[in-house]
Amino acid sequence: ALREIMLTHDKIFVMGHKNPDADCVGAALGIYRLSKALNKSTYIVMDKDCPAIEPIVDGIYRERADEEEDIFVTNEEAMLLKDKSAMLIVVDVNVPAMTECPELLKSISTIVVLDHHRQSNETIKNAVVSYVEPYASSTCEMVAEILQYIVDKPKLKNIEADAMYSGILVDTDNFVIKAGVRTFEAAAYLRRAGADVTRVRKMFREDMEHCRIRTAIINKAEIYMDEFAISTFDGENVSGATVVGAKAANALLNIQGIRGSFVLTALQDCIYVSARSIDELNVQVIMEKFGGGGHLTMAAAQLKDVSLSDAAEMLKHTLRKMHEDGDI
């Protein structure tokens, strides 16, 4: 169905969520390659300067050094480029407000959604195809499946295969979280397509400053109600602050007896909450209380107009109440 819809449009825009991560850009690149195989004018609407995807973007430009056109466009450029022949494929997000350019959603009539986050009340309503699979480990896994079984099998470039492999790697925390049979099948396909495990590992190594900050976040963590690890972090003037916070949340799960970990990162008048668990706690329902979402073991939320300390207290209050009500 996706291929048939793409064939009837001349311009194809691929858009992810704000503050894109490896899964977001990897999935976008996979769809980009499919679209180019169908000889379509294709544009990825994404903030290419986001620190979380910097290694991938650098690799793309190295591999595309001889090509003139830029595969990434800004929100403003996308709004100017769109016309009646355009369609929009949204990856790794299904909430309109969390997309890179919500205005684009309103101005293009043919929309396809590919995502692995569970749908909430706030979801993209006017999609002609909505492929939302909460049991998938990542959107890259879903896109890899599409690329494997579609008639016009596109030939991925090495950096594109690397990006998709890294998307699976990051979202599964190195094949530990939500990695099913189809996850490994997708990874095997990407390896055959040119993904290199060593190259991907080098791509996502931490710099020393980030390592120190992550350690500091872990050191100041508070154990709440004997089973929740909570830490806060002022991310101003730290590149990739939300990524560091998410990595710290992952690391806190290694503490014995911890059912869930939460790292709150203050950045640009917003508090970003990274929530993680292994299997005993549904962090998604907790983050939904704050207008966020995600998965059973990996979720997030953004809080506006609140201080870091107040946000931490709000989280504690919510955890205690949900625990008393038997919701967690």
Language-model features, listed with the residues they occupy:
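An acidic intrinsically disordered interaction segment
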Residues: 1-2, 104-112, 135-143
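Hydrophobic helix-and-loop "lid/oligomerization" segment in the mid-to-C-terminal part
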Residues: 1-20, 24-71, 75-87, 165, ...
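Short, motif-level signal for alpha-helix interfacial/capping segments enriched in acidic residues
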Residues: 1-3, 92-95, 148-151, 272
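Glycine-rich, flexible loop/turn motifs
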Residues: 21, 94, 127-128, 286
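Short acidic, glycine/serine/threonine-rich loops at helix termini
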Residues: 26-27, 55-59, 101-103, 123-126, ...
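Short alpha-helices
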Residues: 30, 116-187
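Active-site cofactor/cluster-binding pocket
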Residues: 68-126
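Conserved phosphate-coordination/catalytic loops
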Residues: 92, 137, 243
